[in-house]
Structure formats: structure tokens, C-alpha cells
């Protein structure tokens, strides 16, 4: 595109011509030089071509020349612009034709593409609509679900309260190791106890004893079971002292204690063993060995003919002695057994296992040996 350059050059030439101080005018014969068949009859009068023009003549000549140049400039500009416009029109025509042919050729392909994309566009619109619905539902959910959530929480609180009540009832009535019955001692009383009648004589040089206990209260000495004769009321005693377990054989001086093995209100499986051969003695709580010693009532023999009781001790049983209320047991007892030998570790653990209440001692067997409840003691299941 040279149009701006041409216009600039033309305008610059006109300005230079108009502002020039000196004009060298040359006379031009403007008569028509075409031969029209007429010939002059006389010679033309000679003129002085070098006649100097007046100021007015110079001015008119300058104006005439300026108008001529302006006309020429306008004509040239018009020609240039017309040519440029024609060239641009032709170029645009070629471009339009070139673009029309590919578009016409690609029309069916574009139509097929649009038809293929229409399902995708529809699915996109549907997905956007579903997302908007979900967002709207999520925004309204707290208001809609708070009442329902409150009802659920209230139901959970009631269920928890009911569950606590059931657990409390089960804790009061549940019996361990599959035992079906227990002896309940409602309070400490010198009249409340159980008398045991062994199936075999209590003449022992070794023994093992196990018992399930759930105590409601424990003092300095709370008897679980005791065996005594008229000469020695302390032949065998298993009792609680606060949270400790104590086993006595042959007298008060021969005792073994294990500290912190019993919890009030919870079932505990307690065992004790003794052998006269080395005076070995051991205590077990819930299947674990908690205390052991030797040289306890070594070479001693437990005589027969005494009284075996649970939940109480009879001081001087055969010479008019009585029961001591402060030694009485309160709570529940079940699974009381005595063997005339020392059980192995496996046997002791098995005697406190699940459904172990069918394991019975050969001297006293729970559910087989007669145990009479006295005072307010009673069997419960």
C-alpha cells in the first residue's frame, strides 16, 4: 500500500510551489495547434515575449498554476485511490472464493460432528442440572435433618439408659463359669452362714480349694470358708482382708497373703493350695499365681471330725463357742470346691474358665456336696 506516500509527496510539492519567492514563468502558447484549414492572410504582428508582467499578472498566473496543480493532484489521487480500491476488491473476492469452497466442502462433516456432540452437550446440561439440585439439597439439609438428628440422639440416650439398666441387672444376677446357682449372704450376721457336709473325711496332708466370690463389703477379716476342730478352730481358713487374700493352715502363724487381688462388687475366682511335704503354699487370683511360699505347716496333717462352714468362723466350736458378726461375709459365693491334692497350674486355670462350674472337687464338689444355708442366706440363680 503506497497511497499514503504518494499523497504525502503530492502535498509537499504543492506547498513548496506556493511558498516559493521567485517564479520563473514561461509563456506557453495555448492556441489550438490543430490545423483547421484556415490560414492567416497576413503575418502576425511580432510581440515582445520578454515583456515584464505586472504584479497582478504574476498573481493571476500563480493562481492559475495553483488551480491546475490542484486539479492534477486531485486527478492523480483519484486515480490512485480507484486503482487501490479495485485491487482490494479483487483481493477480497479471491479470499471470499477460497473460503467458500472449503466451507461448502466441509458442511456435511460439520453437521455430522454437531449431531455427534448433541448427546454430550445434553448430558452435560443434565449433569449441571443434577449438580445444582444436589447443591441446593445440601444447602437445605441442615434445617431438614436437625429435627431428625435430635430424635435419633434422644432415642440413643433412651437406649443407653435402658442398656445401663440391663447391664446393672445382669451384674446383679449374672453367675460366672456357667454356674446355675449361688448362695446369697444379704448382710453380715452371726446367724447367716452355710454349713458344708463333705462327701469324704477332711483328713488331709495336701489340698487345693477354689471359690467364686462377689463381695459387697469387706472388713479386716471376712471369712470365705473355715474348717476347725475343738482343738484348733483355725485348721484351714481362706478369708479377705480389705482387698487382700489370706490362706491359713494349721494355725494363725501359718498364713500367706496376696495384696490387692479382689474388687468389691465384681466376681473373682480365688484358689489356694498347700502341701505338708515341704510346707509349700500358693494363692491364685483369676487364673494368675499371686503369692507362693514354703515351710508353712510343714509335716502337718489336717485332722478329720471338724466343722466346715462358708461365710463364717466358729470360735471354739466344740466347747460352747459362737460366731462373730464382724467376721461374717456379705455377698455371693458359688463354685466352691476342695480337692485332696495340689492341682497343677493348668487345672487351676481350667477351674476358673468359661463353663467350668461342672469341674468339681473330690472332697467338696459344688452342686454335689450338701451345703445348708442358715439364717438369711439363700440360694439364688
UniProtKB/Swiss-Prot annotation:
Keywords: Disulfide bond, Glycoprotein, Secreted, Signal. It holds the Pfam family Pentaxin. Its main location: secreted. One of its GO terms (molecular function) is (1->3)-beta-D-glucan binding. SUPFAM superfamilies: Concanavalin A-like lectins/glucanases. Glycans are attached at residue 220. The keyword Secreted applies. One of its GO terms (biological process) is negative regulation by host of viral glycoprotein metabolic process. Disulfide bonds join 179-357, 210-271. InterPro entries: ConA-like_dom_sf, Pentaxin_CS, Pentraxin-related, PTX3. Residues 179-381 form the Pentraxin (PTX) domain. One of its GO terms (cellular component) is extracellular matrix. Homooctamer; disulfide-linked. Binds to C1q. Plays a role in the regulation of innate resistance to pathogens, inflammatory reactions, possibly clearance of self-components and female fertility. This is Pentraxin-related protein PTX3.
